[in-house]
Amino acid sequence: MSEEYPPLTSEMSDFMVRHERVLYVAFGGRFSTTIENNSKLLQSLVEAINKNIIDGVIWSLVQSSKDDFFPTLNLTDGTQVQTSSILNNEHPHIHIIKFAPQFAILNHTNTKLFFSHGGAGSSHESMYTGTSMLVLPFSSDQFGNAEKLNSLV
């Protein structure tokens, strides 16, 4: 692990202060999933906020674009949400960013869960900061990392 990490930007710090139960989502810069999975995940995040399970989401979307999501999310209560409004950071409780100061986010007391691909760097940072993880491995060492992390529980 590095000795120095980028700090939270003022915008990110303001978001973190306004939200006491933040879910941080990051799958690294080299992994992506399907339009269906991206849209289902985004819908699930909105539903979790609406049900007051969490009150904020930071999602680091390094290589994704609007084309990686369905244009509309159909929520379980029958309402529809335009994906573009979320991806343009118009949702007050979801912050989408290209680059995340990950260690600073994980080290913030309001970050309650890290949804990750389980890469070595992410796993080490999460363990160091004591942030709980939900791991969705995509390839290579991530499957083994997920098993090792699970054995620590």
Region spans (language model):
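Catalytic core of nucleotide-sugar-dependent glycosyltransferases
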Residues: M1-V153
